[in-house]
Swiss-Prot record:
Belongs to the type-II 3-dehydroquinase family. Keywords: Amino-acid biosynthesis, Aromatic amino acid biosynthesis, Lyase. Its EC number is 4.2.1.10. It comes from Prochlorococcus marinus subsp. pastoris (strain CCMP1986 / NIES-2087 / MED4). Homododecamer. Catalyzes a trans-dehydration via an enolate intermediate. Substrate binds at N73, H79, D86, I100, S101, R110. CDD domains: DHQase_II (cd00466). GO terms for molecular function: 3-dehydroquinate dehydratase activity. The keyword Lyase applies. The record marks R17 as: Transition state stabilizer. PANTHER family: CATABOLIC 3-DEHYDROQUINASE (PTHR21272:SF3). This is 3-dehydroquinate dehydratase.
Length: 146
């Protein structure tokens, strides 16, 4: 089983950007820890991060034939990107939307997601643990539905 983790803009700054909201772990730390969990479950996890909307769209489109499921923390693109939404829909790859913070308890503009209604699930507000919960969720979903 191949799963793609996509991280959007500014998530490369984890560990230094607003640690009171996002914690102290770097994206590299999170990816290493997630890969350990994935390997224990015989899952191939590919990690991708970009600050550029088009690169994320390209990655989704190029993954159609090789990826079983997607985990996506689209960052600020969650609230703005119709093109990422359309790429996810067009790919027909099941995806879990995830967020470190609870986007529904933050600023008004963060409460709207262009992805939620098309995701198989959403994990939000559990800090870095959101990544691990999302991984467990997509594995379970794919195990039942494939």
């Amino acid at each position: 089983m191949n799963i793609l983790l996509i991280n959007g803009p500014n998530l490369n700054l984890l560990g230094t950007r607003e640690p009171e909201i996002y914690g102290n772990k770097t994206l590299n730390d999170i990816e290493k820890d997630l890969n350990k969990v994935a390997k224990e479950k015989s899952i191939n996890l590919e990690c991708f991060q970009s600050n550029h909307e088009g690169e994320i769209v390209d990655k989704i489109q190029s993954s159609v034939s090789s990826i079983s499921g997607i985990l996506i923390n689209a960052g600020a693109f969650t609230h703005t990107s119709i093109s990422i939404r359309d790429a996810l829909i067009g790919s027909k790859i099941p995806f879990v939307e995830l967020h470190i913070s609870n986007i529904f308890s933050r600023e008004e503009f963060r409460k709207e997601s262009f992805l939620t209604d098309k995701a198989i699930g959403i994990i939000s507000g559990f800090g870095i643990t959101s990544y691990f919960l999302a991984l467990e969720g997509i594995i379970e979903f794919l195990s039942i539905n494939n």
